Amino acid sequence: MPEILLHQYASSPFAEKIRVCLGIKGLAWGAVDEPVIMPKPELIALTGGYRRIPVMQIGADIYCDSQLIVRELERRFPEPTLFPTGDRGLIQATALWTDRVVFQAAVAIIFGGLGDNVPSAFIKDREALRGGSFDTASMGAAVPHMMGQLRAHVALLAEQLADGRTFLTGERPGLADANSYYNLWFIRSAYPPATTAFDQLPHIGDWLERVRAIGHGERAEVSREAALDIAHKSEPLAGTIATQDAKHAGKQVTIAADDYGRDQVCGVLVGSSEHHISVRREDPIAGQVVVHFPRIGYSIDS
């Protein structure tokens, strides 16, 4: 059984980011396929309420959000690095651009373009996730503007590649490539007509093909039931708590995203740093697990 389990589904753009990172590192991992829409009972048993994809599981440690998954992969499996030129902080900060600004443009283009072809069950699910409207008609009206915005964003990548480099930071692939690739992969996969926004930009097509050719590492299929059994039989890692969180140490807290998908996760604070927050919780199916969240984009309340 692979040590790394990735709870994912094939069409998830954020899962694709992590799959590319696994490919860069050449890691073996288990794909635990989750439903695209709720309910997701096995995933919720592990996370305590967090429903977004992907989630990485290593034993009884559950890592939520792609930004923290990247950090944990690099910590546990440092070579080959996702930061071949260093610049760790700067490159990780690019996720705030790709995961928010560029991703929102991609969502509007894809679902605005698909329009009435988007299943009603999917719309209802995403409205529950967002806590607001998922209006494909409004997205459709915004498509011309968003196509222009997307082209301008991708033109920055073309500018970076203009000196003939193989990948965005040099001759070796890294997180900058995975971050910048997945939204374009998402558009190509979900709504190919929109690739006209970037296909004619110089260097982009060849770079996309080079990133695609990296692959996804060594993948095996793992059932959701098997993943739960692994969690139940494992012991989570111990942690330390940062000074700024000392008042919450050993106490019940609530963690929630501050953008969308704000489902609260409750547990005892057992670890934190400038980069993460960890809570221990008990589940009748999954057993004792520690659920880890990134610090950026998440709130902690007592």
Where on the chain are the PLM-derived regions?
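Short, hydrophobic secondary-structure boundary micro-motifs
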Residues: 82-85, 168-170, 220-221
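Conserved RNA-binding domains used in RNP assembly and mRNA/RNA metabolism
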Residues: 219-302
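GST-like domain detector, emphasizing the conserved glutathione-binding G-site
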Residues: 1-129, 136-137, 266-270, 277-302
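Charged, low-complexity, helix-prone segments enriched in Lys/Glu/Asp/Gln
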Residues: 91, 95, 126, 146, ...
